[in-house]
Curated annotation (Swiss-Prot):
The gene is rhbg. This is Ammonium transporter Rh type B. It comes from Danio rerio. Belongs to the ammonium transporter (TC 2.A.49) family. Rh subfamily. The chain crosses the membrane at residues 11-31, 59-79, 88-108, 122-142, 150-170, 177-197, 217-237, 249-269, 275-295, 297-317, 341-361, 393-413. One of its GO terms (cellular component) is plasma membrane. Residues 440-459 are annotated as: Disordered.
Length: 459
């Protein structure tokens, strides 16, 4: 076991090679945008520095960044002996993914005269892409090596950028909060990967695939950070003014309604009426996922609350009934239950977005219609029903790319070259980390065993 999981050559090799390649590509392809470059900014905007996009976008970026590194990281620390890996590997793949995403998204969206322009908006978008990778990470948590995760990130970020380009640039979809591009894509990509990586003997580590009191408390820290900052996440790249304001408000009320639904149904599905911490940690966030696409639209506060309530309901029911079915019948071993937090609520959000877009009119939006649906300003033949149709097509495209991409990635990750943990050592930090106290515990265990053997001989 020790030899097969030894990463002394594998991990340094892939980390160093990837970072060297990234540095070279950044040196050749990347430059500051007009709001970041000293010469361009001071030439074009010599009056008021407060008009720089930094002051409009950075507060949202800061919140999103905390969600990626603190929220997602702590949320996955629920496993009793996998806290180092949950936080550490989250840190590793996020740091890589945001760099690779800058290049991939820039290639499709931000090329200017052969250069990729970066600034605070591109940083937010890179974090969004990273979020999709971390969602997929949740499906394979505890069963993969960091080398596998980096390879998965390379492929997923690339396909994320392709899917995002098709949805936003070709189909003209609205998806500022990422119900489709982030949550649905990340969830079904990860579910397909974990299906291909199915471990028939994972029961050998079943006792470690659970939480203890303090690990659930740590995970709840992640939940609270995500819950508080989700309005910033959904509104981060929306248009300034009323669309951004409306998105934050819709997310705010959706999350609140979702939380009450989560507590209610968590108690309802338990024969003794007790709450399940897994439901509270995860399903309470589903409202933020489900309102991501329609958040900037005139969904109304009560509409947002209905969406949040539905999201919390299907998420709890998914954890209670669907996850066990998927594992036993479909052989999908979804460690974090991403299908319930991101998959189904993401699809719900896409459907809500399509319906809300199809019902849009100037009677409701006034001149604000052109700010939410940008193509309406340039096309006199624009139709809300057609827009709703393209939103629905975008969901189908996302599911197709995610499932096919996850299938290919899963088979690549099955190659026996990554130092993956054996079935008996899944969900265990000590496979890849120096864990304080492990050597002492092992020494004490040997002493006790020796003492017992001596006592048996003497008797």
């Amino acid at each position: 076991m020790a030899e097969s999981t030894n990463l002394r050559l594998r991990l340094p090799l892939i980390c160093i090679i990837l970072e060297v390649i990234l540095i070279i590509l950044f040196g050749v392809l990347v430059e500051y945008n007009d709001d970041t470059d000293a010469k361009k900014w001071n030439k074009n905007n010599s009056t008021d520095p407060a008009t720089n996009e930094f002051y409009y976008r950075y507060p949202s970026f800061q919140d999103v960044h905390v969600m990626i590194f603190v929220g997602f990281g702590f949320l996955m620390t629920f496993l009793q002996r996998y806290g180092f890996s949950s936080m550490g590997f989250n840190f590793l793949i996020a740091a890589f993914s945001l760099q690779w995403a800058t290049l991939m998204q820039g290639f499709f969206h931000g090329m200017h005269h052969g250069k990729i322009h970066v600034g605070v908006t591109s940083m937010i978008n890179a974090d969004f892409c990273t979020g999709a990778v971390l969602i997929s990470f949740g499906a394979v948590l505890g069963k993969t090596s960091p080398v596998q995760l980096l390879v998965m990130a390379i492929l997923e970020v690339t396909l994320f950028a392709v899917n995002e380009y098709i949805l936003l640039s070709i189909l003209g979809a609205n998806d500022a909060g990422g119900s489709m591009t982030i949550h649905t894509f990340g969830a079904y990509f990860g579910l397909m990967v974990t299906r291909i990586l199915h471990r028939p003997n994972l029961d050998k580590s079943k006792h470690k695939n659970s939480s203890v009191y303090h690990s659930d408390l740590f995970a709840m820290i992640g939940t609270i950070f995500l819950w508080m900052f989700w309005p910033s996440f959904n509104s981060a790249i929306t248009q300034y003014g009323d669309p951004q304001h409306r998105t934050a408000a819709n997310t705010y009320y959706s999350l609140a309604a979702c939380t009450l639904a989560t507590f209610g149904f968590s108690s309802l599905v338990n024969p003794e009426g007790k709450l399940d911490m897994v439901h509270i940690q995860n399903a309470a966030l589903a409202g933020g996922v489900a309102v991501g696409t329609a958040g900037e639209m005139m969904l109304t506060p009560f509409g947002s609350m209905i969406v949040g309530f539905l999201a919390g309901t299907i998420s709890v029911l998914g954890y209670k009934y669907l996850t066990p079915f998927m594992e036993s019948k479909l052989k999908i071993q979804d460690t974090c239950g991403i299908h319930n937090l991101h998959g189904m609520p993401g699809i719900l959000g896409a459907i809500v977005g399509a319906v809300t877009a199809a019902l849009a009119s100037r009677d409701v939006y006034g001149n604000g219609l052109d700010k939410v649906f940008l193509e309406a300003a340039d096309n006199s033949q624009w139709s809300a029903q057609t827009k709703g149709g393209f939103q629905a097509i975008s969901l189908a495209v996302t599911l197709g790319i995610a499932l096919i991409g996850g299938l290919i990635t899963g088979f690549l990750l099955k190659l026996p070259i990554y130092g993956t943990p054996p079935d008996t050592q899944c969900f265990e930090d000590a496979v890849y980390w120096e864990v304080p106290g492990e050597e002492e515990d092992h020494h004490e265990l040997n002493e006790v065993s020796t003492q017992n053997e001596v006592e048996k001989l003497n008797s």
